[in-house]
Structure formats: C-alpha cells, structure tokens
Regions:
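Donor-nucleotide binding loops and adjacent catalytic segments primarily
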Residues: 1-66, 75
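Nucleotide-activated sugar donor-binding and catalytic core shared by glycosyltransferases
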Residues: 47-163
C-alpha cells in the first residue's frame, strides 16, 4: 500500500500518520509512506510502515496492492498507468474532481476527503480497494488502454495545423 500526499502540507502530520497506521493495522496491510511536503516521516518505527523519500511513481506504483494519495493530476495518471486501485484523499483545486473520476471509472471504492479523514473511513476504503477484485481488474483494464495511447504522437501530428 502506497500512501503519499504530494506537495500537500498538513497542519498535524503526526495525527494523519497515526490514522494511516491504525487504518493499515485494521485492514491487515502494510504501507510505504512517502514523506513529501506533508511531513509524514514515519514517527515510531514498526512493522506496519516504511517511510521513504522521493521515488519515481512509475517504478513504485506497479508493486503496490493499492494507492492512497491526494489525487493530483500527475499522481492520478501515474496510478492509472500502473494499473493499481486508488483511495483518494483530496484536499483542494482539481483533486476532488480526479477523486470522483477514479470512483466513476471503477478503480476506487471511494474518496476520503482529507478534512474527513478518520481511521474507520480509511480502513474501510483500504479493505475494499485491496479485497474487492473488481477494483484491481478495472485498474488493469484501464492500464492497458492508457499505455496504448500515444499522446506525444498525437501532439506531433496536430502541431503543424496550429502553426
């Protein structure tokens, strides 16, 4: 399970990490927490959480059972390319939109807006994302579609008509 909030800073990272740790325990999962700007530095070491710094998402995500993230456009796209279910923790701007799209396309059991983060909500979402195979199957289906796209090629074709 990957947990990361990108460039999002938190008023109380220790409280958020405590919720993540307990949610993982309740769901019977272990997590890799990317500290990032949120300051999720891992706190007290245990067998539930490994804290990491910067790691390329395209390398890490395919190895995860599911992802928990802020639903920024880049992280959302990386999750879709990896073919992994997601639990969104949206905060602001476009994040609620991307979190709702992940639910609509069937790769997420639901979002837990960061302002409503609780152990019960996150543990339930983690359990659904990792134990209900529909999310994994749909994520893998979308992965094949996304990887077949040639976005750069399409841009190269369109550029001459724009100049």
């Amino acid at each position: 399970m990957y947990v990361g909030l990108g460039s999002r800073s938190l008023p109380d990272p220790d409280a958020a990490l405590s919720v993540v740790r307990e949610s993982l325990r309740r769901a019977g999962l272990r997590g890799i927490v990317q500290s990032g700007w949120a300051g999720l530095d891992g706190g007290e070491a245990d067998d539930r959480i490994l804290t990491i710094g910067e790691v390329p998402h395209e390398w890490l995500f395919p190895h995860m059972a599911a992802l928990v993230h802020h639903c920024g456009a880049g992280t959302t796209a990386a999750g879709l390319r990896a073919g992994v279910p997601t639990v969104g923790l949206p905060v602001l701007a476009d994040q609620p939109f991307w979190a709702s799209r992940l639910v609509e396309v069937g790769v997420s059991p639901g979002a837990v807006p960061l302002r409503h983060l609780s152990t019960d909500r996150l543990a339930d979402a983690l359990t659904a994302a990792t134990r209900d195979g529909r999310y994994r199957r749909r994520a893998e289906e979308l992965q094949r579609i996304v990887r077949a796209e040639d976005g750069a090629g399409r841009v190269a074709e369109a550029l001459p008509s724009l100049v």
